[in-house]
From Swiss-Prot:
The keyword NAD does not apply. Residues 292-307 have a biased composition (Low complexity). It comes from Drosophila melanogaster. Residues 283-307, 612-635, 685-710 are annotated as: Disordered. GO terms for biological process: protein exit from endoplasmic reticulum. Pfam families: Beta-prop_HPS5. Belongs to the WD repeat KIAA0329 family. PANTHER family: RUBY-EYE2-LIKE PROTEIN, TECTONIN BETA-PROPELLER REPEAT-CONTAINING PROTEIN 2. InterPro entries: Beta-prop_HPS5-like, WD40/YVTN_repeat-like_dom_sf, WD40_repeat_dom_sf. WD repeats lie at residues 31-70, 133-172. This is WD repeat-containing protein CG11141.
Length: 710
């Protein structure tokens, strides 16, 4: 049996954040995302199984920190989950639609069989689905010890037995019991099945000869009210029949045998009102509403509340009945049960509450694995209560609460040490010498102080610390300390604060430009790495301007262009180019070598936008109705148009074979430049009288004509 010292060391050592963080907070259901909530929990020494309202069982490995998803056939709420450690891990999950999904998970080979591991073939997870037997929500399920049989019960009182054949991969299900009320809890011991309903508790045994189930009611008195009390088999036996304990109204228990004979009645009404042996500390307890002017310690609080209770009231009990029952560490005398928001560890032999956890907000489900108690407090809150902290795995970090007092050491327990003690070896003495040390000052002890005041109990110390945190939580702080809002100017850079506050997750030496938006930010420069190899964010303007010279300095610009010219000449094997301003003599020499163009030729080119434009329609104010040959008409084959009726000019064609030389007639008064291009002199004054353009060719074949590419 577990000693009282071991029970007094039960506490919540660290939050299970590593487990909860691996479960997604939201899940896509149809077109809209929804929150993912946990509904039930079960545990073994190596794994945790957590059901959810999305039809997924989360299978968490406590040694490696890995998380797997076991999906049911239908994505509906999982109401109960049970795990058995047999040849393989068997996980049963009851759903709200009446289906039961069974998952068969292969075990890993032990370390001494690592040589055989490459020869074996890992099998995938297999799923069996039980349909059409449960018509409503499955309330509970229970495995046999070898994992070959599964018993499941629903809210209509139907109990179904499922037998599994792992070799043939078959399952056979049959209905064995139909009660009138909801099944609360199931317990299996050898060939006996203990069924606890809202109305009564019965024992079922299968006859090997007739294959019929014999039903026996526990006790002769029926319940006067419908309560959801559980029942469980004990390990001890009398006359080759297992013993059982079942709950009764009014915080009572019946201890009976498999034949239904009640041996004794255990009442815990007075024991619950008394102060428990140990109050389990919780990291984030719920603040209890207390009477005004009451400052409590562990002893004064219990005595005050016990004396102030009226007749028929129960102290901390939210309801006057216990719920499901489990054995603590396999001991028959220690029961773990709960009500709405309080967890109890009861001692049946001493009629005493060994430990109690009162700081829970709500208990959705709980399970017991040896000396560990896992409590599902909320939709995403899982607590672990144990005398020792969780052993570290490959990914999780062990977080101890420094505010909690150290637990009482359990002497003689094999779990009292997480690691083997370090063996100290004597070091060889290099040289004998005398060590000098300073004596501490001698302090006088006051022997008149009583022992009760000098030694503070762990429970009193814990309550005192909880009172300090409660007072801190009730203090009224300014909201601006927690939530600050400030507006930064767009035109001015942010001023550096001298207070020394560093924002978590940001670098303090990062350069921020005020006129840079998010679209122009770059992750890092391709040519520059800062912060010891880490890329610092730069904006595009700063990334390019840091390599450019000052545009306002002519000297710097001239040097930069000269270097560029030398580099280009070296790459292209060109003679070296010297960039320098031209002198007046060189400028006059260049102007002297440039041929002078006559003034009439210069006037041929248009100098204004109106002169260079092409006219495509008739002009109403035209004074000279002479033909215009440069407004889109072909050079050859010109037709004369009347003054009164003017049409649009057809497409313009030009001879593709121009004369080989260009001639400039100098003897004529009106100098004319002949070329294959249009006469730009006519563009200067379209209303002037021009001579008839001579024909350029006698042939009008299509091979000599092409479109003019303007």
């Amino acid at each position: 049996m577990a000693s009282s010292k071991e029970l007094c060391s039960i506490r919540e050592w660290a939050p299970l954040t590593e487990v909860i963080e691996r479960i997604p907070a939201r899940l896509q259901r149809g077109f809209f995302p929804a929150n993912l909530n946990l509904t039930c929990v079960d545990a073994t020494e190596e794994f945790l199984a957590m059901g959810s309202d999305a039809g997924i069982v989360f299978w968490y490995n406590r040694h490696t920190g890995e998380m797997q998803k076991l999906k049911a056939e239908v994505a509906t709420r999982i109401t109960c989950v049970r795990v058995v450690n047999s040849v393989e891990y068997m996980v049963a999950a009851g759903c709200a639609n009446g289906q039961v999904s069974i998952f068969q998970i292969q075990k890993e080979l032990p370390r001494d069989l690592d040589l055989v591991a490459p020869c074996t073939k890992s099998r995938p997870i297999e799923r069996y689905t039980i349909r059409d037997l449960h018509k409503c929500v499955v309330s509970c399920c229970e495995w046999s010890k070898n994992g070959m049989k599964l018993y499941s019960g629903d809210r209509q009182g139907v109990v179904v037995l499922t037998e599994l054949d792992y070799q043939a991969h078959l399952s056979k299900s049959v209905e064995i019991l139909s009660e009138a009320y909801e099944i609360v809890q199931l317990s299996v011991r050898q060939s006996y099945l203990l069924v606890a309903t809202l109305y009564r508790c019965i024992v079922c045994q299968m006859d090997a000869q007739t294959s019929q189930w014999n039903i026996t009611q526990v006790g002769k008195k029926d319940r006067k009210q419908l309560i959801d009390c559980g029942a469980i088999f004990l390990k001890k036996q009398e006359a080759n029949k297992p013993q059982l304990v079942c709950g009764r109204p009014g915080l009572r228990f019946w201890v009976a045998d498999a034949a239904g004979n009640v041996s004794k009645t255990v009442i815990f009404r007075d024991a619950v009102l008394r102060s428990p042996t140990w109050e389990i500390p919780i990291l984030n307890p719920k603040q209890r509403s207390e009477p005004s002017g009451t400052h409590h310690t562990s002893a004064s609080t219990s005595s005050t509340r016990h004396s102030g209770l009226a007749d028929g009231d129960v102290g901390y009990v939210a309801s006057s009945n216990f719920r499901q029952l489990y054995l603590y560490d396999g001991h028959d005398s220690l029961l773990v049960t709960h009500d709405d928001a309080t967890l109890y560890v009861l001692n049946l032999d001493r009629l005493k509450v060994e430990a109690v956890a009162r700081g829970l907000r709500k208990i959705l489900d709980f399970c017991v694995c040896g000396k560990e108690i896992f409590v599902l407090e909320g939709n995403r809150t899982l607590l672990r209560l144990a005398p020792l902290p969780e052993p570290p795995n490959k990914t999780a970090k062990v977080i101890f609460n420094p505010l909690m007092p150290p637990p009482v050491p359990v002497l003689g327990s094999h779990l009292s040490q997480l690691e083997s003690p370090i063996e100290l070896q004597a070091e060889p003495v290099l040289q004998n010498a005398e060590e000098c040390f300073e004596l501490s000052p001698v302090e006088q002890l006051n022997l008149n102080v009583p022992i009760e005041i000098a030694v503070e109990s762990p429970l009193t110390q814990q309550n005192r610390r909880l009172e300090i945190f409660r007072r801190i939580g009730e203090m009224d702080f300014e909201q601006s300390i927690v939530h600050t809002t400030r507006k930064t100017s767009v035109g001015k850079p942010p001023e550096a604060s001298g207070v020394g506050i560093v924002e978590i997750g940001h670098e303090t030496h990062e350069l921020r430009l005020p006129l840079t938006n998010a679209a122009t930010l770059m992750e890092a420069s391709y040519c520059q790495m800062e912060n010891n190899g880490l890329a610092s964010p730069l904006d595009m303007k700063a990334a390019f301007l840091q390599h450019l010279p000052d545009a306002l300095s002519p000297t710097t610009l001239q040097k930069t262009v000269a270097e560029k010219a030398k580099t280009l000449a070296a790459e292209l094997d060109l003679p070296e180019v010297h960039l320098a301003p031209l002198s007046q003599e060189e400028l006059h020499a260049v102007q002297a070598q440039t041929p002078q163009i006559s003034d009439p030729l210069i006037r041929c080119y248009p100098t204004h936008l109106e002169e260079a434009s092409i006219q495509t329609s008739s002009r109403e104010n035209a004074t000279n109705p002479a033909d215009d040959y440069h407004v889109g008409e072909p050079v050859d084959g010109i037709r004369s148009f009347g003054v009164s009726k003017r049409k649009m000019a057809p497409l313009k064609f030009v001879l593709s074979q121009p004369k080989p030389t260009l001639k400039l007639e100098e003897n004529r008064d009106d100098e004319e430049y002949t070329s294959f291009l249009p006469d730009f002199r006519r563009a200067g004054d379209p209303l002037a009288i021009h001579k008839e353009t001579p024909a350029t060719s006698d042939s009008n074949t299509s091979s000599e004509w092409e479109f003019l590419d303007n």
